[in-house]
Amino acid sequence: VLVKVSCCNRYPDATADFNKYMNQGSLLINYTGHGGEQGLAEERLLDVPTVSAWENIDNMPLFITATCEFSRYDDPSRVSAGELCILNPEGGMIGLLTTVRVVQAGPNKILNNLIWDNNLLEDSLITPTLGDIFTKCKNLGGLYGHRNFTLLGDPALTLNYPKHEVITDSINGVKASSFNDSLGALDLVTITGHIENKNGSYLSQFNGTCFPIVFDKEVTQKNRQNDPNAIPQEFKVRNEILFKGTVEVVNGFFKYSFYLPKDINYSFGQSKISYYANNESEDAHGYYNGLTIGGSNPNAEED
């Protein structure tokens, strides 16, 4: 929500959300838009006092800033907000793929897409280092102004991806790969799955806990257009949680059941199940998006 103050406009809820993701823990945060040495966005989504106040020493993400000179480090008269993200002794960022000079929207978008498409999708058995990521992306496509982009942080560092995969095996007794039915409000759902390594081998020695989250379908939203001269922007979000639970993993296998709530989105579409699992020494992640949800069960049992 836009808040007008004497000097300018602010979005305090957006800043609060940013701080929430910092404190709760995120693997990486990506920002594309206006910015400068003292912060992000004209409305100061992020500024020097905010960065200085972070205390997330155990939850530091990688920060990608497709913006202008956020991390300029050669001005002796001031310390940029990007530098403070690294220098904050109580928290901040584990590293930044960022800018030190004014850049244009075109090269910003190109480099941003290259980082995601070529490296951060983790499509190989070897997780690339931050130095490998940035070197490869800057050398692809003849990027204009590539010297304005830099890496702040340890180039030998790799992101802390979960080591193993969580796989969905069956839904209501039917193999997940063959399940083509739809599920509606008040339906009972039983899901089984297992943990495997990156080579696809079942991990029968994995004993721990799995945390499944079942999301409803994506919905399209539109921005508030607080600036009447701006072009309205549509975007997709998946915020509605239908089930969130804790499941025991025994010998690499897990099983859980739940009822779909009454207040789902009744249109038909693909939901998504996100997984995280861990034990005392290892962790795993995964997702499943082959589950169609919509409508309701007319024969549901009464409470």
Summary of predicted features, one role per range:
Residues 262-272:
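Short glycine/proline/serine/threonine-rich loop/turn segments at secondary-structure transition edges
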